[in-house]
Amino acid sequence: MTVRKLEPLLDPRGYQERPVIKLAPRVTLDDLRKGKVLFYDNTKLSFCNYNQVFIRIKERLAELGITNFVDYVETVRGKDTAELEKYAAMLAKEKPTAAIVAFGDMGTSAATTIVAIALEKLGIPTVYMTAPPGSAITEGVCRVSRRKFVPLLRRRLPGQHGGRGTRAD
């Protein structure tokens, strides 16, 4: 068997700095009971009956004594990275204990991932909900942001069949 050496590829964008992202510290159930949970809908939950996802999550959290919620609905479309990070900073002013971000699909996954990463950078533990083909796009964005984030995206959410859910924790 002959081993063939592959030549390195030349990236026309040049060298790109890719800092390691440190995820926000995880919180306890007691922290969630005392604090506020941010629900961010990038407008995708308005399709079909997808809004039931947040309704059911809130019902389950209420069963655990977690009842302080704040909701935001805003599209990520048409915004660049700086605008998405600025929007995440605005969400962070609510001082949530944790955030749930949804919904990543083909058209919004990359931008919504940027919001989720920005929330993590601001110290807010964030769960990002997505499904194929959006989850593959999310993984790509996270790889660009840094590898440490990617393995955490491969866990299937409870009750999911077929598709891969992504978690940013």
Where are these regions (language model features)?
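Short glycine-rich or small-residue beta-strand-to-loop segments that form or flank ligand, phosphate
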Residues: 36-44, 70-74, 98-102, 127, ...
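Glycine-rich phosphate/diphosphate-binding loop of Rossmann-like nucleotide-binding domains
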Residues: 30, 34-68
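Short, well-structured alpha-helical segments in soluble
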Residues: 84-97, 115-118
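N-terminal amphipathic/basic leader segments beginning at the initiator methionine
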Residues: 1-26
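Short beta-strand elements in bilobed, periplasmic/extracellular small-molecule ligand-binding domains
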Residues: 61-75, 149-156
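Short, acidic/small-residue loops that bind anionic groups at enzyme active sites
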Residues: 111-137, 153
